Amino acid sequence: MDHNVFSQFAYKHPGRINVARDVIAFDMMLDHSCLDIWGILQTPDWYPRFFRGLGSCEQVSGNAQEFEVRVSTPRGAVVVHEMRQTLRESSMLMWFHATQVSHCFVSIRLTPEEGGTRIAVRIFGVGLLHPDLAKTGDGAVRNWVREGLLRISDYLEGKQSSLLVNMGDGHSLLLSVAKTMLVSGVVRASRPDRGLRQLNSLAKWGFTLAGGLGAAAARSPHNIASVDRYGTSTYADVAERTACIASGLAAGGFTSDSTFAVLARNHAAMVECMVAASKLGADLVLLNTGLAARAIEEIIKHNAVDAIFVDDDLDPQVRYLPAEVPRISTHPNSILPQRGSIDDLISAGPGAPPVAPPRQPGKLIVLTSGTTGTPKGARRPTPPGFGAVAAMLSRMPLRRDEVMLLCAPLFHAWGLAALQVSTPLVATVVLMERFDAEECLKTVALQRCTVLILVPVMLQRILELPADVVGRYDTSSLRVVASSGSPISGASVIKFMDTFGDILYNFYGSTEVSWATVADPTDLRLAPTTAGRPPLGTRIAILGQDGNPLPVGAVGRIFVGNDMLFDGYTNAASPAVEDQLMDTGDLGYLDASGRLFIAGRDDEMIISGGENVFPRPVEEAIAALPQVADVAVVGVPDPEFGQRLAAFVVRAPAASLDEEMIKDYVRNRLSRFSIPRDVTFVDQLPRTATGKVLKRRLTDGQFPLETGWPG
């Protein structure tokens, strides 16, 4: 036992040491220098990268030698540890203890020896340091610490270990897919007749929107397929209407070689346009409703669009289109003069020959967010089978006959993915045209929704509602709330689950790679900022500049492999692909438990005074302040340091907050080079229609410093 350490602790904390308690003591050697190992051990927020089962580790107060660290646990509890560091000529010593309880203490001493470093670990009262350690024996605790220290060694050595593959139960991916389909109710062994009709439709139309809708209609024709402000439609209704729309389009001279576009909000008619184009085998461009008229003109021209479906109130955004591009109204009775509608196509459909299944499925073209410039058109692939559905269901427990409130825009990859998974589940999709936080909760209560699909900015708007407003609505029917599209702050994750229960799922992916990882409630309770783990049939790798995997814990480029990698852009070169893994353009790392964390976009990394700084940890730190409603951190030019950090902050209503308070708060939690030099208070941040912050707008010189962005 290290008696000097024991004596120091006993002197400072009299009465806390019970010598009769068990003590875990062991030494081990690592083939690395004391300074290299010490550099990691003195950085508490890195501990989850190497030690399994740890959530966030955040410094909350103190200085470089003595400070407090807050550690989250799987049950959401927080343990605060006091840490102290001592540097001597012959060794380096670190010790810490839980401040809320007595009789617990850990010391780690590093001593240089020939060929490496001897690490002496002494643990007193292990079960009081972390609640999960109380359930294990001394041998398991000793192995846990050893494994963590060995991962630090692997990190320093550069071991190529940042590669994750989810192949299910390990025996067969196909068997895992089949099991997932049975558990979710997509396939039922008890009704082979309905299953046969379902498979016949998929054989006819493929795993497309047309095939999914047709399979659901063949299996459960009288189930409600959609609900919007105009009414309800059964699966049989939608199948019949979309067949007529497709026939009407064919009668008008459109073919599988045609390309359509749709500019619409979430409603049943938009879904019908999408399914009808799928039945015809035509390509369909999903237009963001937030695009300017000139941008839409450019996209229509580039994609050689033959006709466009458009909501009447969005007509000003298509005013620059050539007259030879027909506009088809999505509204039953268009108020616009000489404007045909999808109801006109439905009326013409019964007299036209039915549309035969196309030889090749049409492509859905989804636009990227355009946060770094002009949106790119991404060709979405046709799912090769049930694997795409099984991937989502393997990490999110959706079941047959769900009632799904779809708030995420259908023109966005996330909204589209939710629609695609709804038909195998024969779910009822409730469509919200314009998002309003209170109206969302009201709809959940009225429709008894079991699933809510949204993007993070919508989740944030719900959290901003007063408690008495939230309390008016019974949301107990919700089992799953799924968010995707941009990061959610850790503070918002915890607040949402504390308010609505542990039902939050956070999807990470992109238009190009579809899904990559999913964080379930267990992940989020332990590590609120995690992007989660890969779903079934998915590979994740963190690669370095040489294209090889990096060690666990190291930040590198995130590459993803699955069955739904996109088929390329319509107007740009495709991202890099390494060994069937596609570059997401994001940087991140894997922790010891196999969870992914996003550091930021490759082009967001800030180099200040030679130090690499990512905005996300700084944003997370500032967002934890209750006086902060929203925040974005960017890099701006600096004549001395090359770049410096600038924070744009939205105050919470009636909050008192100034620049120095924010700097002091960050100073106590992150390294000195993570402190923003500039803090600007604004009314709101510029965002895309799906909620992503337009950071380039913050640095292009047109930002109004005093009044923020107009609402």
Predicted regions and their residues:
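Conserved AMP-binding/adenylate-forming core of the ANL superfamily
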Residues: 224-267, 271, 275, 292-297
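Conserved AMP-binding A3 loop
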Residues: 234-236, 363-387
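Conserved structural elements of the adenylate-forming
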Residues: 239-244, 378-399, 460, 464
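AMP-binding/adenylate-forming catalytic core of the ANL superfamily
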Residues: 291, 308, 442-444, 452, ...
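Conserved pre-ATP/AMP-binding loop-to-beta segment of ANL
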Residues: 334, 343-367, 374, 396-403
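Conserved AMP-binding/adenylation subdomain of ANL enzymes
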Residues: 386-403, 411-451, 465
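Gly/Ser/Thr-rich phosphate-binding loop
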Residues: 424, 450-453, 467-527, 539, ...
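Conserved ATP/PPi-binding loop(s) of AMP-dependent carboxylate-activating enzymes
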Residues: 534-537, 545-579, 611-613
